[in-house]
Regions:
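Catalytic-core signal marking the mid-to-C-terminal active-site face
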Residues: 2-3, 17-28, 37, 42-48, ...
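Helix-rich catalytic cores of soluble enzyme domains
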Residues: 121-350, 354
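N-terminal small/glycine-rich loop or linker at the start of catalytic domains
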Residues: 22-24, 31, 94-116, 316-328
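Non-catalytic terminal accessory/regulatory regions of metabolic enzymes
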Residues: 1, 8-10, 31-32, 37-44, ...
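Short beta-alpha connecting loops at secondary-structure transitions
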Residues: 11-15, 292-298, 326-333, 360-372
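Glycine-rich, N-terminal phosphate-binding loop and its surrounding beta-alpha-beta segment
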Residues: 45-118
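Flexible, glycine/charged-enriched surface loops at secondary-structure junctions
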Residues: 40-47, 60-61, 141, 201-203, ...
Length: 487
C-alpha cells in the first residue's frame, strides 16, 4: 500500500462556511483591489513580465495594476492536480482533492529538549531529529525546515537545512527560507540529483517552496524572483500571505480575506504569465491579534475563520489549498496546545485544505517540540476519520444482521464485525483504559508517553541515504559556499 492511501478521505465532509455567492464576492472584491489599487512588486523581473502582459506598471512606485482580463487569462492555465514527489516514491503525495496531508511547521529559532524541557537556540541536528520523527509518524506527510540551523553558515544555511531533512526522511520536503539566486540554483541541483534529472524533477518535484508575501499588498524581490526561477523548473510554489486582522489587514474577516487573496492571486498570475501551467497553491497563514495586548493570536476563532476562507477560494480557482494550522501559542505541550491545534486542523481540512503547514512548533511557531508532534499526529488521525464521513450501503446498514441478532444478539464475534472492525479509529497515544489500570501502570501523562516515544524514534537509525547522493549534496553545498564568498 502506498503511503498516500493512508491519507485518502475521498469526497470529504465539508463545513461550507461560505456559499457560492460569498466566494464570488471575495473574488470580485479582490479583482477590484488589484486593478484599482494594485500590488507593489519589488522585483524588476516581475514588473517586466506583468507589463508585457497587459498590467499597468509604475516603475517608480513599483506598483502593478492588473486588469481582470489579465487575471482570468493567467488563471486559466493553472494545473488543478499534480504530485509532490518524495525521495522514496512510496511517499509521493497526489494533490487531487481526495487526500489530506500535513507537514512539519517552520521556521522556528528555538528547540525544546524532550527530556529536560530546556529551550535553546536551534541547530542542524534539530532538523535531522524532526525529520526522523516525521518519517515515523503515519499522519505527518512531509518534512520541512522546521527551525533554523543556526550552527551553519548563513550563506548556505537553507542548503544545510534541506540536507538534514532529506538525509533523515524519505518524505516530501518543504523549503521556506531561500533568499538568494545561488541558494535557489544549488537547491535545484540537489533536487535534480534526487529525482534523476530536470525532466524527472518536473514530473515529481522533490520540494515545495513557500513564498511569504508582505501584507498589505507587497511582493518582495527575492520572493518573486525565486517564484519565477522555481516555476520554470516545475517546482510547486505556495504563495503565503499572513495579514493580521486589524493590523496589516482590515479588522473584518471578509476584508482581510480580500487582502490575503489579492496577495496570492497576484503571485499566481505572475507565475502563470511567465510559465503557463506551473504548479501553484493557494497558501497563507493569516491570523489575528489580541487587541488588549497586541499579542499574536494564531488560533483565535477569527483567525481560524479567516484561514477557512482560503480553502473556498482555492476551490474557486481550481488549485490546491495549502495553509497554516497548528501554530499554537502555548509555551509547552499540554492542554492549550492540544485544543488549539485540534480546532485549527479540523477547521482547515473541513474547509478544503489539501495540505497544512504544520506541526512541531510552540509559542507561535518559534519553539520546536518533538513530543507535541506525536499529539498532533493523533489529532490528525481523528480528523481524517471524521472527514471520511459515513458510508451508507446495504453492507453497512446491516439490516439482515440486525434481524438475525434480534433482541439478545452479541455482535462482537460476528463475521460482519470481523470484516469491518479495522475501519474503527484506534488511539495510539491517548489513554483509553480504566483509571486503576492507568494509575497502576505509573499514571503517565500523554506528554510523558510522547516523550518516551520520541526517544524510541530517535534511537533508531534513519533509512539508509545513498552514499553517492550524499557526496553530491556535500559538493553542491561546498560550491555554493564558494560562490557566496565571491559575491
Amino acid at each position: 500500500m502506498a503511503y498516500a492511501d493512508k491519507c485518502y478521505v475521498g469526497k470529504r465532509v465539508k463545513l461550507n462556511l461560505l456559499d457560492e455567492g460569498e466566494v464570488r464576492q471575495i473574488h470580485e472584491a479582490t479583482l477590484d483591489v488589484i486593478e484599482s489599487v494594485g500590488v507593489k512588486f519589488h522585483s524588476q523581473k516581475a514588473l517586466d513580465v506583468l507589463e508585457a502582459n497587459g498590467a499597468t506598471v509604475d516603475r517608480e512606485s513599483t506598483v502593478a495594476k492588473i486588469p481582470a482580463a489579465v487575471v482570468e487569462k493567467a488563471m486559466s492555465t493553472v494545473p488543478h492536480e499534480y504530485v509532490l514527489g518524495a525521495r522514496n516514491p512510496e511517499y509521493d503525495l497526489p494533490l487531487d482533492g481526495e487526500h489530506i496531508y500535513i507537514s512539519s511547521d517552520g521556521c522556528g529559532v528555538f528547540a525544546r529538549d524532550p527530556k529536560t524541557g530546556e529551550v535553546r537556540s536551534s541547530v542542524k541536528q534539530d532538523l535531522a531529529d524532526c525529520a526522523k520523527v516525521v518519517q515515523a509518524l503515519d499522519n505527518v506527510s512531509a518534512t520541512s525546515a522546521v527551525v533554523s540551523a543556526q550552527d551553519c553558515p548563513i550563506e548556505t544555511r537553507v542548503l544545510h537545512e534541506f540536507d538534514a531533512c532529506t538525509r533523515n526522511s524519505e518524505k516530501h520536503n518543504i523549503v521556506v527560507s531561500i533568499k538568494e539566486d545561488w541558494e535557489a540554483r544549488s537547491l535545484l541541483k540537489m533536487a535534480e540529483a534526487m529525482a534523476g534529472g530536470r525532466a524527472e524533477l518536473k514530473k515529481r518535484p522533490m520540494f515545495t517552496a513557500i513564498i511569504c508575501t508582505v501584507s498589505p499588498l507587497h511582493q518582495e524581490r527575492f520572493g518573486m524572483d525565486l517564484a519565477l526561477t522555481l516555476a520554470e523548473a516545475g517546482i510547486p510554489v505556495s504563495f503565503y500571505p499572513m495579514p493580521i486582522l486589524g493590523a496589516t489587514g482590515p479588522v473584518t474577516i471578509a476584508g482581510s480575506a480580500v487582502v490575503n487573496n489579492a496577495e496570492f492571486l497576484s503571485g499566481a498570475v505572475l507565475v502563470q504569465l511567465a510559465h503557463p501551467g506551473a504548479p501553484v497553491m493557494h497558501g497563507g497563514g493569516p491570523t489575528a491579534m489580541y487587541m488588549n495586548s497586541g499579542a499574536y493570536a494564531s488560533n483565535s476563532p477569527e483567525a481560524l475563520l479567516l484561514r477557512s476562507c482560503q480553502g473556498h477560494m482555492a476551490d474557486f480557482y481550481g488549485v490546491p489549498a495549502w495553509y497554516g494550522a497548528g501554530a499554537t501559542t502555548a509555551k509547552e505541550p499540554g492542554i492549550q496546545s492540544a485544543y488549539e491545534n485540534a480546532l485549527a486542523m479540523f477547521m482547515a481540512y473541513a474547509n478544503g485544505a489539501d495540505v497544512t503547514f504544520g506541526t512541531g512548533l510552540l509559542d507561535g511557531s518559534r519553539i520546536l517540540c518533538l513530543e507535541n508532534m506525536l499529539v498532533d499526529d493523533e489529532i490528525i488521525g481523528m480528523v481524517k476519520r471524521i472527514l471520511t464521513g459515513i458510508e451508507v450501503s446495504e453492507e453497512t446498514l446491516a439490516v439482515d444482521l440486525i434481524k438475525k441478532m434480534g433482541f439478545n444478539g452479541n455482535y462482537l464475534f460476528d463475521n460482519h464485525t470481523r470484516a469491518h472492525v479495522r475501519e474503527l479509529w484506534q488511539a495510539r497515544l491517548g489513554e483509553t483504559g480504566n483509571y486503576d489500570g492507568w494509575k497502576n501502570a505509573g499514571a503517565r501523562s500523554t506528554t510523558e508517553k510522547a516523550q518516551e516515544k520520541v526517544a524510541e524514534i530517535l534511537a533508531v537509525p534513519a533509512a539508509e541515504f545513498p552514499a553517492d547522493l550524499g557526496a553530491e549534496f556535500d559538493a553542491i553545498i561546498a560550491a555554493a559556499a564558494r560562490e557566496a564568498a565571491a559575491v
